[in-house]
Amino acid sequence: MERRDSGESMSSWAPGRALAAYHAGVTVICELAVRFAEDAWSAVTPCPEWRAADLAGHLRCMADDFHEYLDDAPDSRMARLMATGAHPDSLARKMARQNAAELAALPDGTGPEHIRAFAASARAYAQRIPAVWNLPHHRYRDTLVTAGGMLGAVCAEWHLHAWDLARSLGKDYCPADPDTLAAGWRAGLPQLPLDLPEDLDRPVASSRTARHPAASCAATPGTAAHRGGHGHGNLAVGVGPAPVEDSPVWAALLRASGRLL
């Protein structure tokens, strides 16, 4: 039997909360970008092969790609790749190669220029989704992902890359509503199961020994102040491992994306 949106219950992934979380991710990326001095765009990111300016360019490429996938759904190049049902590691390698090629082909631009183009494209994408929320976007094995479900993957992508930018600045980032991001992940990324802690009140021990595996930022095939509020997220000064123990759900998302071990 066909399963939709890859979760047992996706009631928390509904257009209102979903779009709020999505726009919060775009906004926090823009807010982080203005904190970079001109020479800071050469700072390393949690993806060792990328500087912050490269990450800005990657965001711009992804935002445009998501429009293409929606234009061509359910027969886009992404849909054809996902329809192979390949192992997640194989999918990640293929997407990483695609991302690297697109970044290499991107016209020269500064970090701020790439972020401005990203924001315009990402916000335009969000405007398109409500009208096609329940239409098929792509399929992975026995799971049909709708356009609304795909927004979940994109939403998670923005917040995870916000974390990457924050780490480049020596700061930490935690989204305002990680529960909604987890629902979006499950709606849009059936190939990457999300293992949440059984006891969500229990601190996540591994969060104090964060690692940044190579290529984790490029491989997700897309891969808010306090819960219930309307802020975009929390930024905290810190140069050590990300202090995520107060948000086990966010820690689980960072692990699922390869950013924490």
Explain the meaning of each model-derived region:
Residues 101, 105-109:
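Long amphipathic alpha-helical segments that form oligomerization/scaffold cores
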Residues 2-21, 25-28, 35-48, 68-86, ...:
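Structured surface interface patches that mediate subunit assembly and partner/cofactor docking
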